[in-house]
Amino acid sequence: MANIKSQIKRIGTNKKAQERNKAVKSELKTAIRSVKTAISAGDKDAAVKAVSLAGKKLDKAASKGVIHKNQAANRKGAIAKQVAKIG
């Protein structure tokens, strides 16, 4: 345990940020999972809507610093490519 007052405060701040980041990452996984289920079902309309929502969540996470902007771009591109393959 830290002895310095500022470090004790920092531990609490870091814990809050960690919980917030974990929640955002969980939302991202859920959004991407919904895209993949729509793709596997072959439902193009649902997949397009899910990609839109997932892209929004990825951009938001990147702007908040939860994930890197390049990682967000790569994930968006990957799921968009998969949706484009649906006939």
Curated annotation (Swiss-Prot):
Cellular compartments per GO CC: cytosol; small ribosomal subunit
Alphabetized SUPFAM superfamilies for the sequence: Ribosomal protein S20
Name of the coding gene: rpsT
Region (Disordered): 1-22
Function of the protein: Binds directly to 16S ribosomal RNA.
Molecular function per GO: small ribosomal subunit rRNA binding; structural constituent of ribosome
Keywords: Ribonucleoprotein, Ribosomal protein, RNA-binding, rRNA-binding
Disulphide-bridged cysteine pairs: none
Residue ranges the record marks as coiled coil: none
Family, similarity comment: Belongs to the bacterial ribosomal protein bS20 family.
Stated name of the protein: Small ribosomal subunit protein bS20
Any one Gene Ontology BP term: translation
